Regions:
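Low-acidity, Ser/Thr- and Arg-rich intrinsically disordered low-complexity segments
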Residues: 2, 6, 10, 15-22, ...
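Bacterial N-terminal signal peptides
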Residues: 64-75
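Basic nucleic-acid-binding interfaces
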Residues: 91-308
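Low-complexity, Ser/Thr/Pro/Gly-enriched N-terminal "stalk/linker" regions
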Residues: 309-377, 456, 614-640, 647, ...
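Well-ordered alpha-helical scaffold segments within catalytic/enzyme domains
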Residues: 317-324, 380-398, 428-442, 472-486, ...
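Extended, well-ordered alpha-helical scaffold segments
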Residues: 321-340, 395-417, 440-462, 484-503, ...
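Solvent-exposed loop and edge beta-strand segments that line ligand/cofactor-binding
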Residues: 363-380, 395, 412-427, 459-470, ...
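CBM-like carbohydrate-recognition segments
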Residues: 374, 550-564, 575-591, 596-699
Length: 699
C-alpha cells in the first residue's frame, strides 16, 4: 500500500475547496459407485471406483452430520446474517425467490456424504435428485489443505423471465456440479499421488464449498463499464444471456481465483464463452438477443472435511457495528501490533542479528509474498505505526516491547540505505518514528542530516505548483519539527509559511500528507498561529470523508446485504478496486490523530470528524483477515491478523496493516467510545483477549 492517495481524492477535495465547498435420501447412501458424469463442456471425467467403508467410519460420519445439522439450526454464527437480515434488507417476498441457508445446508450435507462415501449416485437414481428450491445454478469447490483442486458447476438454461426455478428443475444440479468438481480434482497431480497411497478414500479428505445461485435478474447498463459498476463484486454473480442460454460467473470461483474485482473483464470473458465477439453492449444487434443478468447466491464452506460448514461472503462474515466496543477495538489493535511486529524479519535468514526488513504483500492464494520484501516507504510507515504502538498504554506490555524493538530495527535499516534506494517520504516518516521511540544516535543523526539537506534544497528550488511539491513540504516540516534540530528556525519558518499557504488555498494537494501533518498538528510545541490552518484543513478532510462515507445515515445491520460489508468506508470516485477500500486509511488516520491530540478544553471536538470515526473503525475491522475468511486458503495462520487491501481482492499489503493499526489506536485515544457513540449490547465474544503471538485474535 503506497502512502500516496489517488488523484480522485485530491480532485474531490479540490472541487469542495472551489465551490465552498431435510438431509435428502442421498445423504444416507454410501454404496454407489462413481459413474462417469456427462460434462456439458465435454470434459473427460474419470470414474471413481466403488468405496469400501467400514461400519465404524459410517457411524462416525453420521454423528458428524447430526452435529452439523444441529449446529446449523441452533448455533447463531451460521445464521447470524442469514434469513433475518436478508428479510430486513430485501423484504419477505424476496425471501421466497432466493435460496435459503436451509436449502444450502441440505445441498452441502448431500455433497459431503457423497465425498465421504467416495461414491456418487447415477443420475438416473433417485438418490441423485436433491431438491433445491429457488436455485438455478450450483457451483462446487474442492480443496486439499486450502488449495483449490477441483471446481464444477451446473446451471439451468435461462428463460426470458426472472421467475425462480421450478421445484423439479434443479434437482440434478448438485449431482452434476459435484461430479465435475471431483473429476477435475482427480486430475490434480497431488490428488493422484494421495489416491495412489490411500486408495479410494481420497475424496473424503477434501474440504467442500457449495454455492447456490438464485434466479437471474436483469442487469441494467448501457455499456459493460456501466453495468459493472452496478454489481456488488464478490457478493453477486453475473451472467451473459444469449437467447435462452446463460453463461454465469460465480462469486465463489471468482474469489478463489482472486479475479472478482474486474467485473468488466469477467463480462468480456463470458461473452467469449458464449461464442460472441468481445465488443461493448451497444454494438450487439437485437437479433443477437444478448443481455446481462445478475444473481444472488449463498455459499457454505468448511475449512476441513470433518468441520461444520459456515456461511461465507467476500468478507468472510459481516462485522456488526454493535461489536465495535472499546474492548473489541483494543483487542484488534493488539492483534495488528503483534502481527505487524512479526512481519519484521532478518533480511538474511542466516544472520538473525543482522539488518531487518519488512515482509512485502502477502498473496494468500499462492501463499507467497509478492514482492518478498516491502519498499522503504512501506517500511517507514510500519516503523511509525509500531513506534506509536510502543507508547500506547492501551496495549499489553509484551506487545509494546516487541513493537519498539521492531520499529527501531526498521529505522536503523532505513537510515543505512544509500540515496538511490530511499526517498524524502521514507526519511521523514522514519524520523518521526525515531522521535516517538526516543532513539539516539546514530540513526537519528543520519536522518536529521538528510532532512536538513532536503529542506535547504526545497527552499532553494522555490515553491512548486503540484501536489508532489506540497506533499514534500508537509513531510519535511513535520519531520523537522519533530526532530527539533534538523533545520534553522528561519528555514523552518519559511517552509511553514509555504505549508500554511497550501493548507489555506490548495488543500487538495495535501491529501497525500494527511498523516505527517496530523503528527505536526498534534505537537504540543507547535505555535497556535501555525496550528489553526492545519485544524481547518482537517475539518475539510472530515467534511469530505462524511460526504463520501458509505451508508451514511444507516447502520450495517439494515444496509443492503450486497454491500453492507462496506458500510463506514470512504467511497473514493474511480477507485482501482471499484469499491471502498483501504486507500482512504491514511487520511482517516490523520483525522483520528488530530481528534486524539488534545483534550476538549484545549481544542473543541469536530462533531463531523467524530461521527465518522466509529463507522470507519467497523470498516477497518471488516478488512482484518479472520475466520471464516482465512479458512479458504492454504496457510490461515500466516494470513490471520493481517489487513486486506480490499474486500474484492485477497492481497494483504503491509501498508494497510500499518495504517489500520495507527487508525484503531488513534480512534481509541480520541475518546469517541466515551462519547457513548458505541453500542454496549455486543456479545461477550466480541471482546476476546488480546493475542500476543500475532496469529490469532478477534474472529
Amino acid at each position: 500500500m503506497s502512502i500516496l492517495v489517488s488523484n480522485d481524492l485530491r480532485n474531490a477535495l479540490h472541487r469542495r475547496s472551489t465551490a465552498r465547498f431435510s438431509v435428502p435420501p442421498s445423504a444416507r447412501s454410501a454404496s454407489f459407485a462413481w459413474p462417469a458424469p456427462t460434462a456439458r463442456d465435454g470434459t473427460n471425467m474419470t470414474p471413481v471406483p466403488r468405496a469400501r467403508q467400514k461400519n465404524e467410519r459410517l457411524r462416525s460420519r453420521s454423528l458428524v452430520f447430526l452435529f452439523t445439522v444441529l449446529a446449523a439450526f441452533l448455533h447463531a454464527p451460521l445464521a447470524a446474517h442469514g434469513e433475518s437480515t436478508r428479510a430486513a434488507a430485501t423484504g419477505s417476498s424476496a425471501m421466497e425467490t432466493e435460496p435459503t441457508e436451509a436449502t444450502a445446508l441440505s445441498a452441502y450435507l448431500a455433497a459431503r456424504a457423497w465425498l465421504d462415501a467416495d461414491a456418487l449416485p447415477a443420475e438416473g437414481d433417485a438418490a441423485a435428485r436433491v431438491p433445491l428450491e429457488a436455485t438455478t445454478a450450483v457451483c462446487v469447490l474442492l480443496r486439499l489443505d486450502g488449495r483449490l483442486v477441483g471446481a464444477g458447476h451446473d446451471e439451468l438454461d435461462a428463460p426470458r423471465s426472472t421467475a425462480p426455478a421450478t421445484a423439479a428443475g434443479p434437482e440434478l444440479l448438485l449431482r452434476r456440479a459435484v461430479g465435475r468438481a471431483v473429476a477435475r480434482a482427480l486430475a490434480d497431480s497431488t490428488i493422484a499421488a494421495v489416491r495412489a497411497e490411500l486408495g479410494d478414500k481420497v475424496t473424503a479428505r477434501l474440504s467442500l464449498e457449495v454455492e447456490l445461485g438464485g434466479p437471474l435478474r436483469p442487469l441494467i447498463g448501457r455499456t459493460i463499464a456501466d453495468a459493472s459498476r452496478r454489481i456488488a463484486a464478490g457478493n453477486e454473480g453475473v451472467a451473459v444471456l444469449r437467447g435462452e442460454r446463460a453463461h454465469r460467473a460465480f462469486p465463489s470461483r471468482l474469489l478463489a481465483a482472486d479475479t472478482a474485482s474486474r467485473t468488466d473483464r469477467i463480462i468480456a470473458g463470458l461473452l467469449l464463452e458464449a461464442g460472441l465477439p468481445a465488443k461493448d453492449l451497444p454494438e450487439f444487434g437485437a437479433e443477437e438477443r444478448v443481455s446481462l443478468a445478475r444473481f444472488h447466491s449463498i455459499r457454505l464452506r468448511a475449512d476441513a472435511a470433518d468441520a461444520a460448514p459456515a456461511a461465507v461472503t467476500r468478507a468472510g462474515r459481516l462485522v456488526s457495528q454493535r461489536e465495535l466496543t472499546e474492548g473489541f477495538v483494543r483487542a484488534s489493535a493488539a492483534q495488528l501490533a503483534a502481527r505487524l511486529a512479526a512481519q519484521v524479519v532478518p533480511a538474511d535468514p542466516t544472520r538473525p542479528d543482522g539488518p531487518q526488513r519488512l515482509l512485502g504483500t502477502l498473496n494468500p492464494t499462492a501463499d507467497i509474498y509478492e514482492p518478498p520484501l516491502a519498499a522503504p516507504s512501506d517500511a517507514a510507515l510500519a516503523s511509525l505505526a509500531l513506534a506509536h504502538a510502543s507508547r500506547s498504554p492501551l496495549l499489553p506490555e509484551p506487545v509494546r516491547v516487541q513493537a519498539a524493538k521492531r520499529a527501531a530495527a526498521l529505522v536503523g535499516w532505513l537510515a543505512a540505505l544509500p540515496d538511490p534506494e530511499r526517498g524524502v517520504a521514507s526519511d521523514c516518516l522514519a524520523a518521526i518514528a525515531s522521535v516517538e521511540l526516543g532513539l539516539e544516535e546514530p540513526a537519528r543523526a543520519v536522518l536529521r542530516d538528510r532532512i536538513g539537506a532536503a529542506i535547504r534544497s526545497q527552499l532553494a528550488a522555490g515553491d512548486g505548483d503540484d501536489a508532489a511539491d506540497a506533499t514534500r513540504i508537509a513531510l519535511l516540516v513535520a519531520a523537522a519539527h519533530a526532530l527539533g534540530d534538523a533545520a534553522t528556525q528561519r528555514d523552518l519558518e519559511a517552509l511553514m509559511v509555504r505549508l500554511r499557504v497550501h493548507a489555506s488555498e490548495r488543500p487538495a494537494r495535501l491529501a497525500d500528507a494527511a498523516l505527517p501533518i496530523a503528527f505536526l498538528a498534534a505537537s504540543p510545541t507547535l505555535a497556535e498561529a501555525d496550528r489553526a490552518p492545519l485544524r481547518a484543513l482537517f475539518e475539510r478532510f472530515a467534511s469530505l470523508a462524511a460526504e463520501l462515507q458509505v451508508g451514511s445515515g444507516t447502520t450495517v445491520d439494515t444496509a443492503d446485504l450486497r454491500s453492507a460489508d462496506l458500510a463506514g468506508g470512504i467511497d473514493l470516485p474511480g477507485s482501482a478496486s471499484g469499491v471502498a477500500d483501504t486507500q482512504s486509511l491514511l487520511m482517516m488516520t490523520g483525522i483520528a490523530l488530530v481528534e486524539a491530540a488534545h483534550s476538549l478544553e484545549e481544542w473543541p471536538a469536530d462533531p463531523v470528524a467524530r461521527s465518522a470515526l466509529l463507522p470507519y473503525a467497523r470498516f477497518v475491522a471488516q478488512h482484518i483477515a479472520t475466520d471464516p475468511w482465512v479458512g479458504g486458503f492454504r496457510n490461515p495462520r500466516t494470513l490471520r491478523g493481517l489487513v486486506r487491501g480490499s474486500l474484492v481482492r485477497d492481497d494483504c499489503p503491509p501498508g494497510a496493516t500499518s495504517a489500520a493499526l495507527l487508525y484503531l489506536l488513534s480512534t481509541l485515544e480520541s475518546g469517541v467510545f466515551r462519547d457513548g457513540a458505541a453500542a454496549r449490547d455486543a456479545s461477550p465474544a466480541a471482546d476476546p483477549a488480546a493475542p500476543l503471538d500475532g496469529a490469532a485474535g478477534p474472529k
